Swiss-Prot record:
GO cellular component, one term: external side of plasma membrane
Positions glycosylated per UniProt: N3, N16
CDD domains on file: 7tmA_CXCR1_2
Residues on Extracellular side: 1-39, 97-111, 175-199, 265-285
Main localization category: membrane
Cytoplasmic side: 67-75, 134-154, 221-242, 309-350
Protein name: C-X-C chemokine receptor type 1
GO molecular function ontology, one term from the record: interleukin-8 binding
InterPro entries: CCR1-9-like, Chemokine_CXCR1, Chemokine_CXCR_1/2, GPCR_Rhodpsn, GPCR_Rhodpsn_7TM
Native species: Gorilla gorilla gorilla
Functional description taken from the UniProt entry: Receptor to interleukin-8, which is a powerful neutrophils chemotactic factor. Binding of IL-8 to the receptor causes activation of neutrophils. This response is mediated via a G-protein that activates a phosphatidylinositol-calcium second messenger system.
Length: 350
């Protein structure tokens, strides 16, 4: 596809979501020919994710909070994961509405929902990294770590939230509502004449310390954890880790594609990778598609707990029995059938 050199045909500012002011006077604009994703499909997807996340994560938090006596260290981490997903889910109606007429909610909401999106992502991977370290120390080194003391776990979680806020702060500071010529308003970073330089900083540094480093920590810890479990033939403990492994896998499947496409977009914006109209169109569409996948993650963890976490199901039934919604006989039968698959001091109550 050849570039269209007439600047009246296409304004670089018109690019959606990741659009930014021109960074090079010699840049030759091109017409965006790739079809965008059907906005109604996106809206319906966001609406379903919002409802499922609101219901599912509320139930997860309820089950964990009800199990005061038997709450494990991992439960505290998963409680914070559910809280992060729940807070992000509250912004999904706004993201859905922005797909219709662009960003019509002003600069303040642009900053707030962008902050919640980034905090949800970073807190998620940091908490999962903490779980991996805790499981590594408990299984590989067979020791009760400092995080076994519940009050210290709370400080670790507060540290994860604080670091997530710091990594996400640039999006709160620099994002604003912007209305390009001949296009719908957008919500993105406005960084002045040094947009290219600062965009690289704002993307590479947070994703290095908020994604790549925690990812390698998880790969290291779970690699040695699995090795220890298989060598020792610890089948029961291996089954107890299924929920945690599933949570980590789903997180990576949902967010890794978006971050890889975002990296490609950044490298093209900063001229590290040569940009062409075809590449720009493909990356723009890929960003839209993978962003939806990332947003869907907020409703998936409760589904994992419901299908894999036997103790989560039992905890939920216990709450129902306390309120007379199921019989105690049914609860007792469920406890007997799930007893052989439960674990002690290895996994969470989920």
């Amino acid at each position: 596809m050849s570039n269209i050199t007439d600047p009246q045909m296409w304004d670089f500012d018109d690019l959606n979501f990741t659009g930014m002011p021109p960074i090079d006077e010699d840049y030759s604009p091109c017409r965006l020919e790739t079809e965008t994703l059907n906005k109604y499909v996106v809206i319906i997807t966001y609406a379903l994710a919002f409802l499922l996340s609101l219901l599912g994560n509320s139930l997860v938090m309820l089950v964990i909070l009800y199990s005061r006596g038997g709450r494990s260290v991992t439960d505290v981490y998963l409680l914070n994961l559910a809280l992060a997903d729940l807070l992000f889910a509250l912004t999904l109606p706004i993201w859905a509405a922005s797909k219709v007429n662009g960003w019509i909610f002003g600069t303040f909401l642009c900053k707030v929902v962008s902050l919640l999106k980034e905090v949800n992502f970073y807190s998620g991977i940091l908490l999962l990294a903490c779980i991996s370290v805790d499981r590594y120390l408990a299984i590989v080194h067979a020791t009760r770590t400092l995080t076994q003391k519940r009050h210290l776990v709370k400080f670790v979680c507060l540290g994860c939230w604080g670091l997530s806020m710091i990594l996400s702060l640039p999006f709160f500071l620099f994002r604003q509502a912007y209305h390009p010529n001949n296009s719908s308003p957008v919500c993105y970073e406005v960084l002045g004449n040094d947009t290219a330089k600062w965009r690289m900083v704002l993307r590479i540094l947070p994703h290095t310390f908020g994604f790549i480093v925690p990812l390698f920590v998880m790969l290291f810890c779970y690699g040695f954890t699995l090795r220890t479990l298989f060598k020792a033939h610890m089948g029961q403990k291996h089954r107890a880790m299924r929920v945690i492994f599933a949570v980590v896998l789903i997180f990576l499947l949902c967010w890794l594609p978006y971050n890889l496409v975002l990296l490609a977009d950044t490298l093209m914006r900063t001229q590290v990778i040569q940009e062409s109209c075809e590449r720009r169109n493909n990356v723009s569409l890929a960003l839209d598609a993978t962003e939806i996948l990332g947003f869907l993650h907020s409703c998936l963890n409760p589904i994992i707990y419901a299908f894999i976490g036997q103790n989560f199901r039992h905890g939920f039934l216990k709450i129902l029995a306390m309120h007379g919604l199921v019989s105690k006989e049914f609860l007792a039968r469920h406890r007997v059938t799930s007893y052989t698959s439960s674990s002690v001091n290895v996994s969470s109550n989920l």
